[in-house]
Amino acid sequence: MNDLKRSLSEAAAAAFQAAGLPPEFGRVTASDRPDLADFQCNGALAAAKSAKRNPREIAVQVVDILKGDPRLASVEIAGVGFINMRVSDEALSARAREIASDDRTGAQLLETPRRVLIDYAGPNVAKPMHVGHLRASIIGESVKRLYRFRGDDVVGDAHFGDWGFQMGLLISAIMDEDPFINALMEKLPEAPRGFSSADEAKVMAEFEKRITLADLDRIYPAASVRQKEDPAFKERARKATAELQNGRFGYRLLWRHFVNVSRVALEREFHALGVDFDLWKGESDVNDLIEPMVLQLEAKGLLVQDQGARIVRVAREGDKRDVPPLLVVSSEGSAMYGTTDLATILDRRKSFDPHLILYCVDQRQADHFETVFRAAYLAGYAEEGALEHIGFGTMNGADGKPFKTRAGGVLKLHDLIEMAREKARERLREAGLGAELSEEQFEDTAHKVGVAALKFADLQNFRGTSYVFDLDRFTSFEGKTGPYLLYQSVRIKSVLRRAAESGAVAGRVEIHEPAERDLAMLLDAFEGALQEAYDKKAPNFVAEHAYKLAQSFSKFYAACPIMSADTETLRASRLTLAETTLRQLELALDLLGIEAPERM
């Protein structure tokens, strides 16, 4: 079941071929002037240049063939050879009926699905998420949903930052602060003889009493500042990090507690944001792979000594800029950040063997990923092109710089979500919405409106661009906003409820009015928007479609009465258009990670 653009492209391709020209010139696109035509084909101009012929003559040949297509009410030439096409009401009605009868409202599945792993969010142990995690989380979640909806076998991995120097900082700071834990750590350099699972449970229970999430939130920032001012503390933290990574028993137990406490809190925040993961693989999961991987890189002749460190050179002939080598082992003998990333690629190949791994990470990390990916290709851990960084810009304040609190600090993600929720409550009351809801229902609706405001404000932009945070604008029920889309969704549900209560039923779609045509054309455009979003790993194409669809329904509803339609047949047709619009709109919203309430 092809959309109109694709099926007309096939017809135009056949027409060009019949005219003795390559079929690829028959590409059809949505019209730049929808007041004049539904679709256009500019292939005659390119074909003329290739064949050294007059473009208008070519267009005449193609149009003469296309005029026999029963789906087209008109095919005309404009200017030097542009071909304009208008679809007949009958063909558009038939296409609308196809979409209405399809559970996916016209969205197709891939002919050749792939295994895809998406690495996104990147939360860290003992560090509350901040606004910088917002874009990674919601863009990654949307891309994951989009790829899964298209038919790919997709795994989303949080890539948990649970290893490295910050762990040594925490261990050292807590041992300084709590004499009991300090003494316990001194007693447990390794598992004592006869140390049972019950003994371990007692130790973990003691940690739960003594170290809460609030403690981690307090201790880590202080330790981070302290290591910059206290060389002795910094050295102890480095030693603790090395001993943890080498398997010191007590440190491993304490580390597990840090991970457990942090993950519970992080999952709660992600749930509030409508984000979930299939995997919570941590950097620690590849720790045991690093040493054999380094030996393997050495055996392949890829490791090079450089001022005491060991590196992999990744520069290529023809590079237009310097591409730095991958630092694998430091001069002190430590594995580096990029080493862990390389080992993670190796681990993913062994455990999942994906055709594609996408990294949804800040655009500022582009150079790092270029280096890591090239090293992975050299080592044979991935096929060329199987690793892709889908970068994004920053969310900025009114000054155009990355968003901060009024005090100049980094805003926690939890606080940002609460700000959006509070503003949504205010907006609902201002608009007189939700008055008939219970307190619990009102809070749930406010949460959905607030999250929709944050998500749509972000996802309506191409991910590579930055945007200015403006909560007043984002939470408005008017304009291009998430709350506007939710309002239109709830409005359609209300129309359908009233229709059901009156006994009205949906029926065969017949298109006659301009507003009906416009709505049906947009329903048909869903597949094209999905294809564009999929190819470019860019949810903004889905967001744009959702907004245009909501706008088109609003105009349709104003111009084409449903319940007071002149005939029962007309009412049934318009009810089907309303039902189909709702289903497609909610599919698009779900791909953006936005949930619509039932009532407002």
Curated annotation (Swiss-Prot):
InterPro entries: aa-tRNA-synth_I_CS, Arg-tRNA-ligase, Arg-tRNA-synth_N, Arg-tRNA-synth_N_sf, ArgRS_core, DALR_anticod-bd, Rossmann-like_a/b/a_fold, tRNAsynth_Ia_anticodon-bd. SMART domains: Arg_tRNA_synt_N, DALR_1. It comes from the Bacteria. It catalyses: tRNA(Arg) + L-arginine + ATP = L-arginyl-tRNA(Arg) + AMP + diphosphate. CDD domains: ArgRS_core. A motif ('HIGH' region) lies at residues 123-133. This is Arginine--tRNA ligase. It comes from Caulobacter vibrioides (strain NA1000 / CB15N) (Caulobacter crescentus). The gene is argS.
